[in-house]
A protein has these predicted regions:
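Structural signature of FAD isoalloxazine-binding scaffolds in flavoprotein oxidoreductases
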Residues: 66-75, 148-153, 203
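FAD-binding glycine-rich core of flavoenzymes that anchor FAD
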Residues: 102-122
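A short, Trp-centered hydrophobic/proline-enriched beta-strand micro-motif
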Residues: 117-134
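A short core secondary-structure module
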Residues: 125, 165, 171-211
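Flexible, small-/acidic-enriched active-site or ligand-binding loops
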Residues: 137-146, 174-177, 204-239
Length: 412
């Protein structure tokens, strides 16, 4: 393993950091989240056209840059530093990989070039608040209970025959960027008990009838959530086979999402720490900078070690996505603790609405609610590794920790 960044990765980091330093400061973030879409459309188009950000990990044959998950993780670390409100995670992490993996050639050709060019945003909608379970990050996704079915509610799909395809009925309560996405990938339950399965469907909100989208008040305004109601809504099956359950395909996508979220959290934690260090260097008390006090130094040193450890885990996961869940747990924990200490070390001003410290704290809390929490992420990995006994009657496995081509070596 060569842990050094390539020249291309360094250039992605440098270019994004310079641009976001100019265009995504705390005041810019506050302005962007209060728009109808919840992000700066002009900046998003610039990131797409000049840097190819949404298509960074998409194949060149579909208009993408042709890089991999590692390059996208480097970019996400920088967007995390700036707390950039954008549809990047929803579009490039949740939706695009599923379209690329499961879509027909016609669907990939029609959708992926538009996503790569920034002309189309997309997101994944799953019933209730079960996104982390559906992605295989927490709980047990294999049974598909999160998708509903029968009396379990969720979102139901029924074929209508002919050219009309499918109709969906149900509700998704927490859809990331669901109020503004131009395309929804909806996970729905189909079939009765003998043929019960979970399928993915394409819903185009601008043209489909029977869809109601409402932006919800969210803890973190940079992570806008929406409630999606589907009332006999027209939908197109993603892929060509309506007999194959997609649950197994969601787990690889979940590992990629975990890697990118971990990178974002590390970037946010590092930024919060840097801002706090700069503040304690200039804030004076008792005739000297508060950063010169030993108690403050020790707290900042502990935070630095925590952030660096989380960064190391995130970088490893970008190379070995199977470690994504553990990296995400460590990164979210690091961000939560660092953001809380940032508020405390800023003193009274850190508790004011005008200061940016609370933006980092809200990002930490909201991401844990949506994709965690931390203890469930770790518990899920432990269960899968068989630390509490063989999972589902299977022999213990170290696959949750293994690197590509490492013959299931455990990364310690």
């Amino acid at each position: 393993m060569d842990a050094a960044f390539t020249a291309e990765q360094d250039e992605i980091r440098r270019t994004l950091r310079e641009l976001l330093a100019k265009r995504s400061g705390p005041d810019d973030v506050r302005s962007a989240v209060r728009t109808a879409d919840g992000y700066d459309e002009t900046l998003w188009r610039q990131l797409a056209q000049d840097l190819g950000l949404p298509g960074l990990a998409l194949p060149q044959e579909y208009g993408g840059v042709g890089c991999g998950l590692a390059e996208l993780a480097v970019a996400c670390e920088e967007t995390g530093r700036a707390l950039l409100p954008s549809p990047l995670i929803a579009t490039a992490a949740l939706a695009a990989p599923l379209i690329a993996a499961l879509g027909t050639e016609a669907q990939r050709t029609a959708l992926l070039p538009r996503i790569a060019a920034g002309r189309l945003t997309a997101t994944l909608a799953v019933p209730g608040g079960s996104l982390a379970t559906a992605l295989g990050l927490t709980g047990d996704p294999t049974g598909g209970a999160w998708a509903g079915g029968g009396r379990a509610g969720g979102i139901q799909a029924r074929p209508v025959g002919g050219a009309e395809g499918w109709r969906l009925y149900g509700e998704a309560a927490q859809v990331l960027d669901g109020h503004s996405a131009g395309l929804l990938l909806v996970a729905a339950h189909a079939g009765g008990f003998p043929r019960s399965r979970t399928l993915l469907f394409l819903v185009r909100p601008d043209t489909a009838a029977g869809i109601v989208r409402a932006r919800r008040t969210s803890l973190d305004e940079t992570r806008p959530l929406a409630r999606i109601e589907l009332r006999d809504t027209e939908a197109e099956l993603l892929g060509a086979d309506d007999t194959v359950d997609v649950i197994d395909a969601l787990a690889p996508a979940g590992r990629g999402v975990a890697v990118l979220l971990a990178a974002e959290a590390v970037g946010a934690a590092a930024s919060a720490l840097e801002r706090t260090v700069e503040y304690v260097k200039t804030r004076e008390q008792f005739g000297r900078a508060i950063g010169s006090f030993q108690a403050v130094k020790h707290r900042l040193a502990d935070l630095y070690v925590r952030v660096q450890a989380a960064r190391s885990a995130a970088y490893y996961a970008a190379w070995a996505p199977a470690a994504g869940s553990l990296a995400l747990a460590q990164a979210l924990e690091s961000l939560r603790i660092t953001a809380a200490e940032a508020v405390q070390l800023h003193g009274g001003i850190g508790f004011t609405w005008e200061h940016e410290a609370h933006l980092y704290f809200k990002r930490a809390a909201a991401d844990e609610l949506l994709f965690g929490p931390v203890h469930r992420l770790r518990d899920h990995v432990a269960q899968q590794a068989g630390l509490f006994g063989p999972p589902n009657g299977q022999p213990p496995s170290s696959s949750a920790f293994a690197a590509p081509g490492s013959a299931e070596q455990v990364a310690v």
